[in-house]
Amino acid sequence: GDKVLVQTPVYNCFFSSIRNDGCVAEYNHLRYEDGVYTIDFEDLECKAADPSVKLMLLCNPHNPAGRVWSREELEKIADICLRNGVFVVADEIHCELVYPGHRYTPFASLSEEALLHSVTCISPSKAFNLAGIQIANIVAADEEVRKKIDRAINVNEVCDVNSFAVDALVAAYGEGEEWLEELKRYLYGNYET
C-alpha cells in the first residue's frame, strides 16, 4: 500500500487511521536533544523522496512532544513535501493551546502551494474540553480535495453530527475566548511549577 509519513512519537490514533485505510506508516522519528524535540530533516527528505510516500500526517503543534513548530521548520517541511509530491494533512487540533513565547503558524498559511496541497483539521475538543461532542472541521482550499473528503466521510458514516455538537462548536469559537485565555494561564502556571 501507499506510505504515510508520521513524526514519532505521535498521537496513537494516527497509526490505526493509516492501517484502516490500507496504508503503511513511514516513520520520520523526531530527535530528542537537551529536552527538546527536533525534526530530522535529512531523514524526512530521504523518506519523502520514496515514490510510495503519498501523504504526511503533520501534528502542528505536536502531540505529545509539545513542540510548536516554527515557521522556518514548517517551510522546510512544505518545501520537502511539495518537491516530492507528498500531500500534507495538518492535524492542528492543539492550535489554541499555545503558551506565551510561542507562535502557532498554520501550515496552510505558508504559501498558496502549501494551501492547495494540504488540508487542515481543527476542533474545539482540546482547547474547550469538548471531546465528548465529537465534532471537528476539515479545511481544504482545493475543490477536488473537498469532494474526496466528502466521499470519504460519507463512506465511513462520520458525517452525521448532532445539533448539540454544532451549537457547542459555535459557542466555543464565538464566545469562549475569555474562558480559553483563563485556561491557558492556568495550564501555563502548572507548566512553570
Locations of the language-model features?
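Conserved PLP-anchoring active-site segment centered on the Schiff-base-forming lysine
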Residues: G1-I18
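Short beta->alpha connector loops at strand-helix junctions that form conserved
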Residues: T8, Y27-Y32
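Hydrophobic/aromatic ligand-binding patch that stacks against planar heteroaromatic rings
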Residues: S16-S17, I80, L110
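A short helix-loop-beta submotif of the ANL/AMP-binding
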Residues: N20-E26
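A short helix->loop->beta-strand "cap" motif at the edges of active sites that frequently abuts
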Residues: C23, R83-F87, L115-L116
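Active-site phosphate-binding strand-loop segment of PLP-dependent enzymes
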Residues: L30-H102
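PLP-dependent aminotransferase class I/II
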Residues: H117-T193
